[in-house]
Amino acid sequence: MREIVTITASHRANHLITQFFNGQERALHERDEQAGSDPSVFLHGTIDADGRTMSYEPRAVLWDAKGGSGALGRFQYWSQDDYADEEEPPRAAPGIEVVQTAARVRRSAYQRALDAGEAPPALTAAGARYWSDYGRMIYGQDSVQELAHWHHDVAAPSAPDFEALGQRRFDRYENGYEVFTEECARDFFDISLHRQLEQCDTLQGFNLVTETDNGWGGFMAALQEQLREEVPKVCYFGWGLNVDESGPRHPPRAGFQRQSNKLRATLAMLEQSDLYFPIRSEAADSLWEAGGWACHVLDSVNSAMCLEKSRTLRFMNQLADRLHSGDEQRNVVSLMSSGQRSYSYFADAPRHRSSRGDPHTFSRCRLLRGSHSPPETTLSVENLELIRTYAWRPADTIPETARNLHHIDLGVTEKCRDVFKNWYEMVAKQFRYDPDREELKERLGTLGAAYECGWYSDDDSGDDT
């Protein structure tokens, strides 16, 4: 087998991965004989007691803040002691006082329908505040993990609240790095990861999905750094979720902190990943809607890794080799687009003052979903490799506006140079007292040069700051 384990960190990332696994659940029932997917790549199957059916659970570990899983109990569906219907008040033995420490979260109408074996209602943003409100698969007993001291805030789901006191937020890269290293690493490696690896025969790699704007980026950076040491000989795809900066403005100090978080998390993840995908999300979209759109890319990339019959591609490292195009240092996928929209945060970055003309494309490929053929005009694009995979099967949880998808274009372009050069200047001008300032400048300068096509003079580089 060619198993892929997915690890997510943050409420936004869990919305995305819920949409992805809902699609995997649908694929179990609608497999295409000619270009079908192998469910064992992303799902662990066990034979039921009757010996005639199989049950599947995602090969995944999900991290969230305390209470971030909503109405889903950690051992719900595994132990009745962990389940309480929201219509029933807590029961206690005589003489025992029940203390409620957080507001009770009721199951969504969608989940109540699934649990009752009924047809679920259509989803709306209001009915999908938590990723567990519309999850169609049951996760393993150790797959859903929560931070011990940082509580989920419905009003600010990307900024967990320390002990729910309203005084400290999980909004700094350093916070996340420290929390994983000191509080979460041991249980993750000894319990959650160990269980996932035990269920794999031939692990091909990991998908690591997180936000970059807040403490979760540091959390995933620490996790990936240690994971790469623990499991070194597999492929790593990093997925960084970035909220569009053109959305609601933040106070100057908060805006700078978000940029600092984004810079550090992106550098940490891309240096530990074989391919890094900087995903852009509209600030106006709900997490449910943003997850539905981002699933276009996540599902398309991973669909190429689980084909039962493929003449072109079967493994993560094969896609990485195609996009590296001979230079493993160029591992940022800055082109991600379909006929509907661009999904890349890097693609919308402002041009650096030294940039010349349109950015050069080093490599690109098109993932065709099913039998749909692209227009002839796009087939003439130079160096465009076509990779055909199975048809896009959107789950009923994908927003209606995001259910059409024929292809996804991926590419490594010179646009990365703009990002790294702009970040270089930001570090040089604003990171005056950071102890790692010179190290960051060196790393950004090296990365910027790796994505240059042609000759740039020293005056063009902007590296004299």
Swiss-Prot record:
Record-level GO cellular component terms: cytoplasm; mitochondrion
Q: Does the keyword Mitochondrion apply?
A: yes
Superkingdom is Eukaryota
Listed GO biological process terms = mitochondrial genome maintenance; mitochondrion organization; plasmid maintenance
Which key words are in the record?
Mitochondrion
Q: What is its main location?
A: mitochondrion
Pfam families with a match to the protein in the record: Misat_Tub_SegII (PF10644), Tubulin_3 (PF14881)
Q: Where in the cell is it found?
A: Mitochondrion
Q: Which family does it belong to?
A: Belongs to the misato family.
Briefly, what is this protein's role? Involved in the partitioning of the mitochondrial organelle and mitochondrial DNA (mtDNA) inheritance.
What protein name is recorded for this chain? Protein DML1
Q: Please give the organism.
A: Eremothecium gossypii (strain ATCC 10895 / CBS 109.51 / FGSC 9923 / NRRL Y-1056)
Gene that encodes it: DML1
